[in-house]
């Protein structure tokens, strides 16, 4: 297999960096500081990595000007303002891209479906009636597209993905293995001790430049659509219920669950294992730390927490006991005790001042 090589000059130009060293030096991959060899380029993304960079065998380093001044003058450098961003940009250069195009013989495609000539449809893919697959989009083996599904250009659908009836996906969207989009929402009407199923008549709309991880579920709406706006990134094992709306450029980490008809604003961050109840609104620019449970709307931007951090087990037990005891003490009584303690402290402070 021919491994592509890129000159240091070419890579510096791609990340709009300033080159120091041998401009013709060829590199064939990215690697960590610890594992890099002479044909690799690595990056320094913080003061704590400077010592590792001094010991690294990398052929070149991406650094800030401040870090460059702390490292050997003999090394090759690309100097940028944000090394981590430059690293992210170069991962696309060194990515092993899939160049295969066409439709595999085992794929089953409805005659009414429209597939771009330069798309790729993998083995045993099933594509239903009136579907549209855009230019340069890749759909890997065993994926399923129900009727009236649309995928824009430059998309990537990994193996065993199910895109159910009516799902609409725009350009440059990546969907990873075993994810299901457009499944039936969890809607039931309780009556006389039984649950009566509500048919989910909406669908799912996904904007441009969205990334959805593996084993996610995004349910279609009951009446209106479930909407994922442009630039949203979703980790693995995330559940998004019917009629949810996720604002543009929001990031959702693994194991989050968002209940039905909730609206999450733009540029939000949901750290791992957050839970969000249904029918609430979270404004723009909100960060929820790990394992937070959101039970009411959030109207002001900021960082919010409700998860309990790790502590030694015996300490945790004592804390839980005290926490339960708080519920049995009226708030007015707690306030009186605090006022009494404050009075005692002030009295002691006055006594010490007089003695001085």
Curated annotation (Swiss-Prot):
One of its GO terms (molecular function) is N-acyltransferase activity. This is UDP-3-O-acylglucosamine N-acyltransferase. Coiled coil: none annotated. The keyword Transferase applies. Keywords: Acyltransferase, Lipid A biosynthesis, Lipid biosynthesis, Lipid metabolism, Repeat, Transferase. The active site is at 242 (proton acceptor). Transmembrane segments: none annotated. SUPFAM superfamilies: Trimeric LpxA-like enzymes. HAMAP family: LpxD (MF_00523). It catalyses: a UDP-3-O-[(3R)-3-hydroxyacyl]-alpha-D-glucosamine + a (3R)-hydroxyacyl-[ACP] = a UDP-2-N,3-O-bis[(3R)-3-hydroxyacyl]-alpha-D-glucosamine + holo-[ACP] + H(+). Gene3D superfamilies: 1.20.5.170, Hexapeptide repeat proteins, MurE/MurF, N-terminal domain. One of its GO terms (cellular component) is membrane. Pathway: Bacterial outer membrane biogenesis; LPS lipid A biosynthesis. Catalyzes the N-acylation of UDP-3-O-acylglucosamine using 3-hydroxyacyl-ACP as the acyl donor. Is involved in the biosynthesis of lipid A, a phosphorylated glycolipid that anchors the lipopolysaccharide to the outer membrane of the cell. GO terms for biological process: lipid A biosynthetic process. Homotrimer. It comes from Acinetobacter baylyi (strain ATCC 33305 / BD413 / ADP1).
